[in-house]
Every structure is written in C-alpha cells, then in structure tokens.
Amino acid sequence: MIIMRNYKFKLESLHQNQKVFRRCTVHSTVLHIISLHEDWSTRLTYKLSLYYCKIKNCYTTFKFEKSNRSIITRAERIINVQHLRRCKDIVDNFSGLISILLVLIFCINLSGCNTSKRLAYDNKYSYKELSKDDPHNLTYIGHYKVGKNYKIKGKIYKPYTPKYFTETGYASWYGGRKDGFHGKKTANGDRFNRNLLTAAHKTLPLPCLVKVTNKANNKSVILMVNDRGPFKKNRIIDVSQKAAEILAFKNQGITKVRIEYLPNETEKFLKKINLKKTENKIFANNYKESLFTKVTKNNQCSINCHIKLVNLKYKLAVNP
C-alpha cells in the first residue's frame, strides 16, 4: 500500500510491463491510474493519468534515465473549472508521485534479478541463445591468414588487406547436404559449419567481417570470411546456408549482392576471439595453445555468437 497525502493507492496488477494503481476510497467513480511503458534500449517512460468521474483532468509524463533519476518532461492540465483545484493539488505533489514511481523502479529491478545475462544491443537474446548453433565453439581453431598469390583455373588471385573495399556481383551459397563441405576444413584451418554466419572470398584476409546486402530485397547480414572461393564465373562470394536463408535467396541459389569489408569491426572481432594478426601459422598455433586453452573472454559467447553481436549492433537479423 502506498500513501500520498490523503490518497491511498493499491497495486492491482503486475503483468505485461504494466503497473496499475487504483484509489481506495468510498467513491469508486474516482480513479487514479499509473501505466508503465518500458523501452530498454533507451530509457524507461512512465505515464501518469488522473481521472475524475470518467473525466480526464490531468496528464503528466515522467521519463527516467538508466540512472533512475526522475525528470519531469511534461505537465499538462486540461482545464476543467470544477476539478482544476483538486487536479492541481495532486499533480503539484511531485514528491508523492516520485515516491510511487521509485517503487515501480524497485519492482523492475527485482524482476530482473533472476533473468539470464542479456545483450547490450538487443534485450531479446541472451548469449546462450546466440551460441545455440555452436555451443562448444568457444575458441577459434583457425589462424589469421592473408596468403600468397595463387592460381586457380588459369587465373591469378592476389590476397591482400584493404583499407576500404566494396564489390558488387553475384553470390551463391554452399553447405548443402550433398555438396560435402559441411564439417570440412577451411582455407585458414577453421571448420566449416553451414549453420554459422560465414562466407568465402577470393582475396580478403581470413578471418574478416563483411556486410553482404541482397540487391533484390535489401536484406543484409554481417558474415565472417574464413574460406577461399567461389571460383565460378561471375561469383564474388559464397555464403553459408544460414546466411542464404537470412538473405532470402536459398531457394533460387544465386542473387546479386553488394559486399563491404568492415575493417574496424574486424579488428574488434579479432581481439574478442583472441586472434593475433600474423602470417606465421606455427606462431599462431603456439599462440592458440597458450591462450585458446582458456575460453574466450565471455565464456558464454561462442565464435558465432560474437558474429551475431556485430549484427545486432547494426540492427540486422541473425535468424531467417
């Protein structure tokens, strides 16, 4: 029970992010309702509506930053001569109102104590959920590689690390049940998994992050390049089966795309998975033995989870 001056409010319901307080008086026609709207990505917004005999006399909006400090951003009174004085007395009693709202915040904090760890970019997912496709893939088994020039079908390819890179052309996907790629080693020693957000490119460093956009429907996804290919005419990138599902071209097989190399996100990603940029494979393996015997910094987040985190950062879908 919460008391504000001579007004008593009782908590009636607590579900679907709404807290409703009703005034406990002899006159049941007089209601005071406080509704709560939660926006976890920005702030908590509280709206207080005061009703007198089914007439809306006062409307006040409270906004709370994550620091839980109250900021009254709007106080609007609808003029009604008969109830103006009574309305003003209640609305101006900010200390009482703030006390009520602080109790609401306390309820929210209690409800959040037992929830699993949530992501900064999207409260919908947990690390465990994002790691469901590779829950044991907590250490990166591949090595960093740019590689030397190589020749395939009479054509020479020159791998390099660009500062800026975009390319437009056709994408295909691999990892179907009949093509035999699932579970095979990639060009940098990683293990290909058709359910992860990965791709193959002819010249980009391995691994690196690229943004792939389907020109037909403008759907985008950020992928980790960990293999070489494709080597068919007019194909610029091969994506995993999961990526093809997200980009919505699995059934048609190929689609026109635009790819963009993300150097800054790649640097951050390499640090998160504890992978040092070196062309020396032996050194990379030694480095792996000393560091990768321990799980990554967040022992609940797999390699694919880290890729999904980058997607969520840019508000991109991580599921079809």
Curated annotation (Swiss-Prot):
EC id: 4.2.2.-
GO molecular function annotation: lytic endotransglycosylase activity
InterPro entries: RlpA, RlpA-like_DPBB, RlpA-like_sf, RPE5, RplA
Domain of life: Bacteria
Keywords tagged on the record: Cell wall biogenesis/degradation, Lyase
Tagged with keyword Lyase: yes
Top-level EC class: lyase
Protein name, as recorded: Endolytic peptidoglycan transglycosylase RlpA
GO BP terms in the entry: cell wall organization; peptidoglycan metabolic process
Keyword Lyase: yes
HAMAP family for this protein: RlpA
Species of the source: Rickettsia typhi (strain ATCC VR-144 / Wilmington)
SUPFAM superfamilies in alphabetical order: Barwin-like endoglucanases (SSF50685)
Role played: Lytic transglycosylase with a strong preference for naked glycan strands that lack stem peptides.
Protein family (similarity comment): Belongs to the RlpA family.
